[in-house]
């Protein structure tokens, strides 16, 4: 509102599964942050997709990484040459997956309270959600595939991107977060 730049960096904020695009507005001062930093903040609703082109559902990865950036650039003075992406829990998975899968698109990626979900065992009540997004209820079978964040880090081509992973011992995904943190430390992202 108070910034008069010709274009603005874009921060994509992704909510956890079960929250919609209003979660950041309801629980944080995200509008004040955007104004203070002079950035555009986009908060898409990813439903229960984990930011993926769902096996049984919509193409959220395509929407997040291609269609929405084009739309944002059409309607706002967005600098798509400087994009950042961050998310919480399942949104954190989506943020890292997008950043690692589309080299050069993001300058920074951050995940809060989420690791590489391919190392987790999930409650059976999540079976339908997982099957719709990933095509399986046992995500451990996806280790070594393009759905495995550890594999994406090990094979990443864009090491100029800043990568951040934050988690605590109280997080639901602490086990896979620790494994992902170890993978990041062993990669060229940590140098």
Q: In which residue ranges do the predicted regions lie?
A:
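Non-catalytic cap/lid and distal C-terminal segments of serine-dependent acyl enzymes
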Residues: 1-191
